[in-house]
Amino acid sequence: MLLVSELEKTEHRKIGFVFCVCTGKCAGFSKMDMWDFINIIRAECPVEYAFIHPMLCDEDGERFLAEFLKKDRKYMVAGCAPIMQKKLFKDSFANAGLDVNKDLVPIDIRNMTTQEALAVVKKTLEETQK
């Protein structure tokens, strides 16, 4: 009989999805309906959860990540350039016992319509689950 902690280790965990919107006023998201986007991801994609954060790279975003990130989970962050995300979140991931190069799936969805961004997320999720 498996204990709960052993069961958690053996079952495949879905990726967590975070949409960082740069305060919600970034021109890079003007072609997208952010609420439709996050609700479609939450309801139709194979993610554990999906939510919007206003600005992960600000001080409160760093505090949020410090409390939120859990070991043994992957996180997809949709927002700015992947190189920037890795640089910004490296310490937060390391402090949580995570490897930003392995446990973060950063995607840039700026300047896309809702449908274009959904296509990128779905394709990336498929590739991540292989």
Identify the residue ranges that each predicted region occupies.
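Iron-sulfur-associated redox domains of electron-transfer enzymes in respiratory
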Residues: 1-130
